Amino acid sequence: MHNENYSIIFSSMTGNTRKLADKIHEILPKESCDYFGTADAQGTESELLYIGFWTDKGNADSDTLDFISKLKNKKIFLFGTAGFGGSDAYFQRILGNVKSAIDSSNTIVGEYMCQGKMPQSVRERYVKMKESPEHPDNIDALIENFDKALSHPDADDLERLKNIII
């Protein structure tokens, strides 16, 4: 995988997925990189595409879904971040949803997901919800997850990504 030209294409709303994209770019040979940036026609020239997304309602963001649905005959490494990082099963469900948008002529050569921090407005919404007598039973767990996510992607997340890439 390291001897061919590649592109790193990503969507990042809060900077989390950008951190992963930067790490991949740091690891791989610079001279083999055809494109680094957001979804763009020139990024599709490479045979190997590293495609990064942020999670929106259990799937990739709409820009990424639109981009990947048009790809044909590519090798694809998926990477993404999600605010809720409770389990690998959750990450696998997201990846499964993303893969279902990819044409069968493409080959998935790898994948990686980790937790990512969320905007402060999310925590404020949770706290406001908790004040309501009809708040969800899991509201404390949601607030705890938000607080845990603040440091992600962290050094351990980036090291795990590096180990998958190399």
Predicted segments — roles?
Residues 9, 36, 79:
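The conserved SAM/SAH-binding core of class I Rossmann-like methyltransferase domains
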Residues 29-42:
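A short, well-structured beta->alpha microelement
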Residues 2-27:
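N-terminal beta1-alpha1 ligand-phosphate binding loop
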Residues 18, 22, 40-55:
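N-terminal beta-loop-helix "entrance" segment that forms/cooperates
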